[in-house]
Amino acid sequence: MRKIAVFLLCCMFMCMYANAQFTAADQPLMNAYLENDMPAWRAFIHATDWEQATQDERQRVLAYEYGYCAAMMETDKAEAQKATQLFHSHVQAMEGLLPKGYYEMYLSAIYAFEFKLGQSFHVFSILRYANKALELAPNDPIIVGYMGNVLFYAPKGIGDKKKALALFEKAATLFETSQWKYCWNRPAMLLAAAQCYEKTGRKNEALSIANDLLNEFPNFTYIRDIYLPALHNAK
């Protein structure tokens, strides 16, 4: 369960579209997230001609590349390495073109992926760039949630689950007045909040969020098949 939870939590901020709008074309990929169908994301990434893509299209590709890298960390390290290298090159190409805080957030994610692959041990760079992103965009729900994610999973002595929970709660409030309220960023962030409540001994709050998510998204297979059953059985 731990590996799946880590994968899903990593993936939860994958749709960092910045200012690119969620469209009907994204709905199948949202369903792919809910149903853990990462090949659909890979197909989308490789079907996009980066050189010919518009800025919005490139932002969209970065969003799915991020999630795809996170997924491959648990299933195919060789593919994860290639995907991370491609993601890094694309992020560098977009320096100065992304909304405030997003370049730094992506760099933080790249350091996290490289750490997971054993290619980099700059743990503090993960936190440094995440903090910079939050400083630049303190009211962006995706960036706020990402910082919560970093603190949730950072090693002991660096991470802080209570601070992470406060950030997840802030992100949840910000999502309510955000263009992303109806995108998958919101349910994904709420899953993180549920997991954080669980890890801080607040099982009832975790159950409440998870049940609400399943009512809203019946095809959220991780919650339906893994998280809720395990949470019900937890002491």
Give residue ranges: language-model regions.
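Terminal, low-structured helical/coil segments at or just beyond the last alpha-helical repeat
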Residues: 181-235
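Structural register within alpha-helical repeat arrays
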Residues: 28, 61, 66-68, 107, ...
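Flexible helix-coil transition and linker loops at the boundaries of alpha-helical arrays
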Residues: 47-60, 90-103, 131-140, 172-184
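The tetratricopeptide repeat
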Residues: 57-58, 62-64, 103, 110, ...
